[in-house]
Amino acid sequence: MKKLISMIVIMFTTIVSTAFAGDKVTIQLKWVTQAQFAGYYVAKDKGFYDAEGLDVTIKPGGPDIAPAQVLAGGGADVMVDWMPSALAAREKGLPLVNIAQPFKSSGMMLTCRKDMGVNTTDDLKGKTLGVWFYGNEYPFLSWMSRLGLATDGSANGVTVLKQGWGVEPLTEGQAACVSTMSYNEYWVVRDAGYTPEQLTVFKYQTEGASTLEDGLYVLEKNLGDASFKDKMVRFVRASMKGWKYAEANPKEAASIILDNDDAGVQTEKHQVRMMGEIAKLTAGSNGSLDPSDYARTVKVLMSGASDPVITKEPSGAWTHDITNAALN
């Protein structure tokens, strides 16, 4: 009898837990767990996803993880990526669609040492510049093309050093400049002992070379599924709630990031500082893509006369369907 009762209890518990289990959503991040993705971790920690009936799995990225490949292979429902790489992938046959744009501004920069002769963009000619690849190189290549600087190492151009994920090429003198983000690597350079007066910083946002970063992308075919669209509406709504909470509570958001840093490599000082910088980039966005920002990004990517990132105006690369339903 006791065995029968136990079996009934187990069956009832299973039925109840199944009935109340949220719809599963997996998001693939562009990089490792850090404040760059605070909105998603905050939304999960504060129960915003639960309130929308979602069971969200957050997959950190890394140097050997290509979010678009994970998405294409069915390993995620939605991914965080920069628009240049997403549009380049779309032109090459992977139909990615932007469904939301939490980041309004670009944090990408080129940070240079003044003692290596770089004070203005005119000084870049003949210099070695550290550049990130894996899709991150597209804004840089477009910018160099607009400046009339070849990237093949010729005398009238620049030499591109394939940069890893550190800033050692700059600090050790291998490159005059390296790629940095306003919220991350720039501060690593500063922590290495360099003062603002010793550095020349070119912000893509002010150089007219900025492109949209950290948008949410899905596969186009999935948007034909009503249940998938419904999940994305709820996901975007909860995620933007997480982002606005993180903006208003940077220290708490940083603490949540540290709690989810399974690798244990992040520090409180760095994450609090990063969250403060990230908030400057998400400010002004409610999650809905601004068509003028999209048009600017496309213009930048197509502006390379000899080697444009994309060769034609994209069609169907973004939609307001999700954000209109989620935010209005």
Predicted regions and their residues:
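Short, glycine-/small- and polar/acidic-enriched structural segments
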Residues: 23-163, 169-172, 176-183, 202-204, ...
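Periplasmic-binding protein-like
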Residues: 102-112, 195-224, 236, 276-278, ...
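Conserved C-terminal helix/tail region of periplasmic/extracytoplasmic solute-binding proteins
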Residues: 294-328
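Sec-exported extracytoplasmic/periplasmic mature domains
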Residues: 45, 72, 91, 145-149, ...
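Bacterial N-terminal signal peptides
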Residues: 6-16
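Secondary-structure end/capping motifs
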Residues: 224-305
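Boundary at the C-terminal end of the N-terminal hydrophobic targeting segment
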Residues: 19-21
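Positively charged n-region of N-terminal signal peptides that target proteins for export
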Residues: 1-4
